[in-house]
Amino acid sequence: MSEKMSPLSFRQLLTRALAEYEREGSVFGVRAKYVSDGRSLPLFGGRVEMPFGPAAGPNTQLSQNILAGYYAGARFFELKTVQKMDGAELAACIARPCIKADDEGYNCEWSTELTVPQALTEYVHAYIAIKILSKRWELGDPDGFIFNMSVGYDLAGIQTPKMNAFIDGMMDAEHLPAFTRAIEEAQAILPDMAEYIRAIDPHICRSVTISTLHGCPPQEIESIASYLIREKHLHTLVKCNPTILGYDFARKRLDAAGYDYIAFDDHHFKEDLQYEDAVPMFHRLMALAKKEGVSFGVKLSNTFPVDVKAGELPSSEMYMSGKALYLLTMEMAARIASDFEGKLRISYSGGADALHLTELYRAGIWPITVATTILKPGGYDRFLQMARRMGKCSYKVRARVDARAVRALSEAAAGDPLLQKAPKPLPRRTIGRPVPLLDCFTAPCREGCPIHQDVPEYLHLMEKGRAPEALALIARRNPLPFITGTICAHNCMSKCTRHFYDTPVHIREVKLQAAKKGYRALMSAPPEKQSLTSAKVAVVGGGPAGLAAAYYLGLAGAEVTVYEKEKQLGGVVRQVIPEFRIPSVSIDKDVRLVKAAGARFVLGKAAPTYRTLQKKYDYILLAAGARKSALLSIGGRELNAVAFLKAQKAGETPVLGEHVCVIGGGNTAMDAARAALRVEGVRDVTIVYRRTKKYMPADPEEVELAEKEGARFLPLLSPLSAESGRLTCQVMELGAPDAAGRRSPVATDKTVSLPCDTLISALGEKTDLEFLAEYGITPDASGRPPFRSDNVFVLGDLRRGPATVVEAMADALAARDAIVGSPLKYPIPEGAAMSQCSAIERKGVLTVKDPEPRRCLGCQVLCENCVTACPNRANAAIRIPGKAMPQILHLDYACNECGNCAAFCPYDSAPYKDKFTLFATMEDMQESRNSGFFIADREKELLHVRLEEKEFDCCLKEDTPMSRELETFLSTVLHHYEYLLV
């Protein structure tokens, strides 16, 4: 494929918009229709119904992008920057992919990739289309939006003939061929609007934003602004760089918010516009603008240049945006608002989104433009929420920016949890397999769950208040809802698409609510047993793996006996995990549910020998846990964390002394630290870890609880020896980042000594190889036993080493399927699946206050992340007769290989490379390796198709080498989505 975009003609732009709106109720894939309430604000000699819109960038490069934004509620458009270097020359300088917006944003692209004349044509087309469609569809006042040019990067370039023609053409397009031709075509397409179309005002733009390169001298910036104010009489904004804050402040604020890994030095801070030069310059430009009868202000802010250190993008430098930039831009706004006493207009573009928009506006900062938020799932649809929130604001214009309010916003930003970097490295969001050509919508939460819980369905049942049915559905796959509702590692939450919106759905919390509210009903009518197998099964171990196996196999009809050497069931959860983390009553409830499946339990004694079990049972399931304790053995008084916790829970707490050191960084270490703090005589507990706190494997909430309860964290220390009440540790330091950006600890020659009466080692447990040998199990070279050896299965921690409860359950479920000979099947309750209408309503809506089930996006019903995140509308959703799930078609002609869609696909794939692709020409197809098709003859339905590595010509009216599903897909595109064909 090629990164070269092919702009739509005006006829294609307008006819597609009209056809799609009539058939689908959407415009270029945007369903979120905004209709103005009739109010507007005066700005730059015009009026805007909404004081926000897309920033100069990928969302204002093509005409369809701009029209899509307008439809969803945007009314102020900062058009993509135009400069003398353009077209193929500029495109060749941009590394691909060039956008990464999965958390804070990064890009390595800059001004328009079109030629300057092409850019002018795109903006003319978008302007005329909005004028026409706003009236035809009654979306708002056709004069209620504003286009704002963005030009750069030096005065000489701006004064070149092609740039001068661009600026003049935007100011008055009456005699431009692009304008007159579009007006004529529009009249031909919509003859009933001919009179209105002829009268469209050709004055497209009255304002400009100046963008300059880093290192541009203040004299150059002032000369550009003076020229545009004095010679062009344009309302002018100067875009400022965050470097104006100074290196020390920027580094300190970003570090405090968790962005300490973002790499930059001070050279841009030294070379860029300095604050002491900016203030007098802005005063002079304010005076000049007043004299010329136009307005002047600043645009805060430009993106922030940082170094590529972890292969984020294929360049050496990239530009940061989004929530991290908000932290810097708000401080810029606070300083400028204060020093200019609110008299200098501030236009904002630095990580704003729907949750911060109205705060900015009420403080007198507007117009507001956004980029990163609309590059995430929901895309342009996010504008509708912004419009609805703005609709609650007064449109009484402030005379000045409220400096106190802006200062408060800057200070609040520093502590805003939505702007902070996650305390742990972001988990892998994808599900570990490639995206299929068809039927790709999936629930990443379910895919991320080791037992593939029906997460969206039980969330939806809980949303409807149907807790008993929600728990009954949970219990089909999960016999331990109280345990997993309390201490599950919740891999599901790590995959949640809401990570790209605000915060993930708290799925574990909802599961626990379902368990509490639905338990009585479930126990009165537990899951029915089936007769799928008559096997006799012995389970050795009554922890989570053994309990789950007894439940799954018992419900399948097996005759199951569980042998547990302890007097109570529950394994490590019962014997080791402290009561303050999970109460025994919760474990008891799960055990009662498991017992309802009919297994027999033998407690308080060891299981019979392997030979005895072999004679009596068809299958043996080993679920005895990781039985070998790990110790440092470096001297001093040392306890194993598991042994310590087990003793304390049994009421046999040892004397620890005053000073306790816990070695390790997992949940067990946190439990041990919290438990030690509760022991009489203990004055302090120190958690020693050889990496940084950020890389501790413990759950963030467990780390936070340990810290709140008084545990002290000492990272980057590696224990060497313990004696005479002291622990000696080697000081570590972080080495250079690896390819993934992770910095491993490296030993130094420094040591520290800590007071330590007792050392508690939380280093994980090991598999008991001798125990496995008794059952004829031989581990592989890495020491890991096989899942199955003849009729013996190895489950949970015994197989994996220290693992999670839900991973142990996954092993049990896999053993059940192997013994039964078929996967677990069951009906989904009626009404458990979210409707597509409900899923559509939730797309693009940021919320952290709604009830958790309501925040579910229904990804398995309607994903479309790649559709909504694409700024160019290069991924289209195709509805096929007889299929509930829309299919994704990639449009090669609209794609510039920015790569943005790849960040949000739940699969290990890049939709712009891996989804079935429509090519406009055979030449385009030959430049690509995508599976896809070119229409050789539309009337005869002749296609040239590439399917994986095979290419062939075919006719859809005859038999083809393709599947019937793919034939139907292509036929639907030809006959019902002909407006996509160019």
Q: What are these language model-derived features?
A:
Residues M1-E231:
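N-terminal capping/small domains of soluble enzymes
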